[in-house]
């Protein structure tokens, strides 16, 4: 309920409502703590290049599909990529390798999707550097690591930063909890590229910007991947009851 209300305030209101004005002190505190976290972080550099795919807003924007596509493109060009992720929604925080037969509650649904669709090694862990080190120890052939989410996880050194936005853009442009931003929009000037997932307007920065479009293929059960259903078959049908 609260999440839906905040989404409306962040992305549908052009001006700050009185309720959001009351949250301004929390936004200032969040900004201060975020800056301290970045300043105090001691980045761990892995022995292979690291590409971080993240975003500035809370919630999904298309990071996982882009990570999957990048893994496929790197493989096609002779690289041996591996993927690390936080694994949101899982029961633990430790480093866990993700296999095709892993359970979503153990590794997270998005890392499980990546493991099944990408065909590359995947490892989850709250500490991405530890997850990357474990992945490299188990798969020494890996020569590049993709980090699905983790733009704000400064404990992991990175060589390339890609930021994804969807059609909602940056919302009202304010920091959490007044707006949806984890970091200020000025951060866009320091990343390597901005990827717009059906983004309607561009940001006024010189950072290279590219467009992407997601197209549904088929659905399958996470607990039984053999059961599939094409997206076309579900056209016009209600899915929630």
Residue ranges and their predicted role:
Residues 38-100:
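Walker A (P-loop) phosphate-binding motif
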Residues 50, 80-82, 143-146, 238:
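Residue-level preference for the first positions of well-ordered beta-strands
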Residues 2-3, 11, 26, 82, ...:
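Residues lining hydrophobic/aromatic ligand-binding pockets adjacent to catalytic sites
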Residues 2-49:
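A transmembrane-helix-recognition feature enriched in membrane-embedded lipid enzymes
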């Amino acid at each position: 309920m609260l999440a839906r209300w905040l989404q409306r305030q962040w992305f549908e209101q052009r001006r700050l409502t009185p309720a959001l004005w009351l949250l301004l002190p929390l936004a200032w505190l969040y900004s201060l703590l975020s800056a301290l976290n970045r300043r105090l972080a001691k980045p761990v550099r892995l022995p292979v290049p690291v590409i971080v795919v993240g975003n500035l807003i809370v919630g999904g924007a298309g990071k996982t599909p882009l990570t999957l596509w990048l893994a496929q493109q790197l493989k096609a060009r002779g690289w041996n990529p591996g993927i690390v992720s936080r694994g949101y929604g899982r029961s633990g925080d430790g480093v866990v390798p993700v296999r095709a037969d892993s359970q979503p509650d153990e590794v997270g649904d998005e890392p499980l999707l990546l493991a099944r669709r990408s065909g590359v090694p995947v490892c989850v862990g709250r500490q991405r550097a530890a997850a990357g080190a474990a992945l490299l120890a188990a798969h020494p052939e890996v020569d590049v690591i993709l980090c699905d989410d983790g733009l704000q996880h400064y404990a992991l050194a990175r060589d390339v930063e890609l930021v994804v936005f969807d059609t909602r853009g940056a919302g009202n442009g304010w920091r959490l909890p007044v707006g949806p931003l984890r970091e200020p929009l000025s951060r866009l000037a320091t990343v390597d590229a901005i990827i717009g997932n059906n983004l309607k307007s561009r940001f006024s920065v010189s950072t290279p910007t590219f467009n992407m479009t997601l197209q549904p293929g088929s659905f399958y059960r996470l607990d039984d991947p053999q059961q599939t259903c094409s997206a076309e078959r579900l056209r016009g049908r209600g899915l929630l009851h």
